[in-house]
Swiss-Prot record:
It catalyses: 6-hydroxymethyl-7,8-dihydropterin + ATP = (7,8-dihydropterin-6-yl)methyl diphosphate + AMP + H(+). Belongs to the archaeal 6-HMPDK family. It comes from Methanocaldococcus jannaschii (strain ATCC 43067 / DSM 2661 / JAL-1 / JCM 10045 / NBRC 100440). The keyword Nuclease does not apply. This is 6-hydroxymethyl-7,8-dihydropterin pyrophosphokinase.
Length: 241
């Protein structure tokens, strides 16, 4: 994504939520430094998986299990379509014995499921922001096949060689921006509901399978919808029904 365009979104998001830009920078620098010595993979590996293909992208919304069943039927026809999932959605895939090709995570989902998928071959795109610094320090050194991402627009000016800003704000829409960055042919979206309801996959601490999200979560989903709508003019996007 063009960083000048992203900076407009980024500034609005930071102001709207009252987030600390300096913390975002700190987090990006820490992740970049950890990845100097961690089990990273070349970014071109993502390109090999995504470029020119129709890509399935899954959030962790209430429709996730319904859409995984549709995915199973579609993949019987074409098994080569890669799967990219947002963070906690990987647990729903594990329950169906499917290992995503790529998981985009800021490390606030089900970490046990994330690590299991990673052990079984999933690439983890770990995202740095101001609220997950301690999780980055604790968990990233234990992962393998890692790619780093950040949300600060000026990451190149800071000479951060091990993180990339693909664009995107939530794990779900970041999956879409990642696929767009690596020139996917088409995005096929599942588990992307953008409503007021959330699942245990996106918030492991809730007691019910589905619950009403808090105000912050709902606002984040609204931004996710806005950002995905922005991409509609740039790449073909289909929502599973």
């Amino acid at each position: 994504m063009d960083m000048k365009e992203w900076e407009i979104f980024y500034n609005k998001i930071m102001e709207d939520f009252g987030f600390d830009k300096d913390k975002d920078v700190e987090s990006a620098v820490i992740l970049n430094n950890i990845l100097e010595n961690a089990n990273t993979i070349p970014v071109d590996k993502l390109k090999d998986i995504i470029e020119g293909r129709e890509v399935f992208i899954f959030g962790a919304g209430p429709s996730i299990k319904k859409h995984i069943n549709i995915l199973k039927e579609l993949r019987e026809i074409n098994y080569k379509n890669p799967i990219i999932v947002a963070d906690g959605a990987c647990k729903a895939f594990l329950e169906e014995n499917i290992i995503p090709d790529i998981i985009v995570s800021d490390l606030d989902g089900d970490l046990e499921a994330l690590f299991e998928c990673n052990r079984k071959g999933s690439i983890i795109v770990v995202h740095a922001h101001g609220d997950n610094i301690e999780k980055i320090k604790k968990y990233v050194p234990k992962l393998k096949n890692v790619v780093g991402s950040c949300q600060i627009p000026n990451y190149k000016e800071l000479n951060l060689r091990n993180v990339i800003n693909f664009g995107g704000f939530t794990d779900g829409d970041r999956c879409c921006f990642l696929a767009y960055h690596f020139k996917a042919k088409k995005l096929i979206l599942g588990g992307m509901d953008f409503g007021i309801y959330i699942t245990k996959y996106s918030r492991p601490n809730i007691k019910e399978d589905i619950a009403i999200g808090d105000e912050i979560k709902i606002k984040k989903l609204e931004y996710a919808k806005t950002l995905i709508n922005y991409l509609k003019d740039k790449i073909e996007i289909e929502f599973l029904k």
